From Swiss-Prot:
Protein name: 1-deoxy-D-xylulose 5-phosphate reductoisomerase
Pathway: Isoprenoid biosynthesis; isopentenyl diphosphate biosynthesis via DXP pathway; isopentenyl diphosphate from 1-deoxy-D-xylulose 5-phosphate: step 1/6
Chain positions recorded as NADPH binding sites: T10, G11, S12, I13, Q38, N100, E102, G178
Pfam family, one: DXP_redisom_C
Gene Ontology MF terms in the entry: 1-deoxy-D-xylulose-5-phosphate reductoisomerase activity; manganese ion binding; NADPH binding
Organism: Tropheryma whipplei (strain Twist) (Whipple's bacillus)
Gene3D superfamilies from the UniProt entry: 1.10.1740.10, NAD(P)-binding Rossmann-like Domain
SUPFAM superfamilies in UniProt: 1-deoxy-D-xylulose-5-phosphate reductoisomerase, C-terminal domain, Glyceraldehyde-3-phosphate dehydrogenase-like, C-terminal domain, NAD(P)-binding Rossmann-fold domains
Family of the protein in this entry: Belongs to the DXR family.
NADP recorded as keyword: yes
Binding sites annotated in the UniProt record for 1-deoxy-D-xylulose 5-phosphate: K101, S126, E127, S151, H172, S185, N190, K191, E194
Keyword field contains Metal-binding: yes
Top-level taxonomy: Bacteria, Bacillati, Actinomycetota, Actinomycetes, Micrococcales
Function: Catalyzes the NADPH-dependent rearrangement and reduction of 1-deoxy-D-xylulose-5-phosphate (DXP) to 2-C-methyl-D-erythritol 4-phosphate (MEP).
Length: 368
């Protein structure tokens, strides 16, 4: 029986995790729940699961993690708000089922150095879960490259990104996700973040991490080995599988999703990223290779741009423009530097500094 804490329990990943746990109650006991919004749903979840320990807000979620005995924490919080929960999980030696990629991207090497056992960070992202499974087929020294697949989002074939509404951007062709990640998928910025995440989780150089468009979202990612073999993980597009894999690690979850129908006629396409999507991907590579606080700065720049789009302050076409502008301004004004402060304090300070810079950029852009 694994004791589980779920932070971000009322969001897309959190609710799917609870559905999975309710079908596997002999294997999991939820000992803590936390969310930032939807208080009534949080109370309902606690009642259904028989969970006494609940918290609301990012700081309270981290406190809950530190104060509660548990085996695994599912961090399903969206965005930079998940940083403190990842920190608290690693600090207390619990296993981390990580859906909140932003926290790892922000914490980088500092968080990796905090791990105390192999598998302490188990990815929930379908792409990284796929890679983790495919890498069991060979030695690290035998890996030639990682190939992250992407659906391409709703606008892959669209030449112009002008006139795209919020409703359009939230309508993902394959996955049912929260608003922030849906928009990040539409701009392909999410894939850029996943490149940084893959580098951190698996230690593969950025030059050996590729992206390919796979509209069907059946092959979730691949590992190419030096002998020419390619090992892929394929399944129906259902987040229950990577959620179940992360919670059940090192074992596989039983009956997580239905198997693929191999007797049915089907088509798997693999296409190159478009010029529009490469802008996001290349920006993420640049931040990742620079390291230090730069990935956190990039993430904050993008979160502000997406929030501005959702608020109607900028167009969809300007999201990556704003992200790139803010990131470039920050890198011109500030450099990575050693600090005697706690790394978490430094990350939070630079995150806040970036958001102030983004606010000015967005206000000036809105006034044009």
């Amino acid at each position: 029986m694994q004791r589980v804490i779920i932070v971000g329990s009322t969001g897309s990943i959190g609710t799917q995790a609870i559905d999975f746990i309710l079908k596997n109650r002999d294997s999991f006991l939820v000992v803590g729940l936390a969310a930032s919004t939807q208080t009534s749903l949080l109370r309902e979840q606690a009642q259904v699961l028989g969970t006494k320990n609940t918290a609301q807000g990012a700081s309270e979620a981290a406190e809950l993690i530190e104060a509660t005995e548990a085996d695994v924490v599912l961090n399903a919080i969206t965005g930079a708000a998940g940083l403190l929960s990842t920190y608290a999980t690693l600090k207390t030696g619990k296993r981390l089922a990580l859906a909140n990629k932003e926290s790892l991207i922000m914490g980088g090497k500092y968080f990796l150095d905090m791990t105390t056992f192999k598998g302490q960070i188990t990815p929930v992202d379908s792409e990284h879960s796929a890679i983790a499974q495919a890498m069991k087929s060979g030695k690290f020294s035998e890996v030639n490259k990682l190939i992250l697949t992407a659906s391409g989002g709703p606008f892959y074939d669209r030449e112009s990104l002008e006139g795209i509404t919020l409703k359009d951007a939230l309508d993902h062709p394959t996955w049912n996700m929260g608003p922030m990640i849906s928009i990040n998928s539409a701009t392909m910025f999410n894939k850029g973040l996943e490149i940084i995440e893959a580098h951190l989780l698996f230690g593969i150089p950025y030059s050996q991490i590729d992206v390919v468009i796979h509209p069907q979202s059946i092959v979730h990612s691949m590992v190419e080995y030096k002998d020419g073999s390619v090992i892929a993980q394929a399944s129906v597009a259902d987040m229950t599988l990577p959620i179940g894999y992360a919670l059940s690690w090192p074992n596989r979850a039983l009956n997580a999703v239905r198997p693929l129908e191999w007797g049915a006629r089907q088509r798997w396409d693999f296409l190159p990223p478009t010029e529009n999507s490469m802008r996001s991907i290349n920006l993420a590579r640049r931040a990742g290779e620079a390291g230090g606080v730069y990935p956190a700065v990039l993430n904050a720049s993008n979160e502000c741009a997406v929030e501005a789009f959702m608020a109607g302050k900028i167009s969809f076409a300007r999201i990556i423009h704003v992200t790139e502008t803010v990131f470039n301004l920050y890198t011109k004004q500030h450099t990575n530097r050693e600090s005697a402060k706690n790394p978490i304090e430094v990350i939070l300070e630079e995150d806040a500094r970036t958001r102030e810079l983004a606010k000015t950029v967005i206000e000036n852009m809105s006034a044009d």
